[in-house]
Amino acid sequence: MDGIKYAVFTEKSLRLLGKNQYTFNVESGFTKTEIKHWVELFFGVKVVAVNSHRLPGKGRRMGPILGHTMHYRRMIITLQPGYSIPLLDRETN
């Protein structure tokens, strides 16, 4: 699971959980096929679709030196109905 950094919990990603879609930030060098294979292998689920977009890095300043953080990719993974990732499911009471 070297390619997947962490799960994302924003307003949009929490809304997508209801549609059985999970959001992850991943290393920018990996393909959709590799991420799909890793998610299916690690979580034991069936992936239907993988959508991605690249987010830009942010500018950083340390005194007079300008720099920036690295860009990364965000993957939205749609699972087949009946499957879920239990660690990321939100409890609804």
Curated annotation (Swiss-Prot):
Residue stretches in coiled coil: none
Example GO biological process: translation
Classification via SUPFAM superfamilies: Ribosomal proteins S24e, L23 and L15e
Family: Belongs to the universal ribosomal protein uL23 family.
An annotated Gene Ontology molecular function: rRNA binding
Top-level taxonomic group: Eukaryota
Complex and partners: Part of the 50S ribosomal subunit.
InterPro entries, A to Z: Nucleotide-bd_a/b_plait_sf (IPR012677), Ribosomal_uL23-like (IPR013025), Ribosomal_uL23/eL15/eS24_sf (IPR012678), Ribosomal_uL23_CS (IPR001014)
Pfam families in the record: Ribosomal_L23 (PF00276)
The organism's taxonomic lineage, starting at the top: Eukaryota, Viridiplantae, Streptophyta, Embryophyta, Tracheophyta
Subcellular location: Plastid, Chloroplast
GO cellular component: chloroplast; ribonucleoprotein complex; ribosome
Protein name: Large ribosomal subunit protein uL23cz/uL23cy
Function: Binds to 23S rRNA.
This protein's UniProt keywords: Chloroplast, Plastid, Ribonucleoprotein, Ribosomal protein, RNA-binding, rRNA-binding
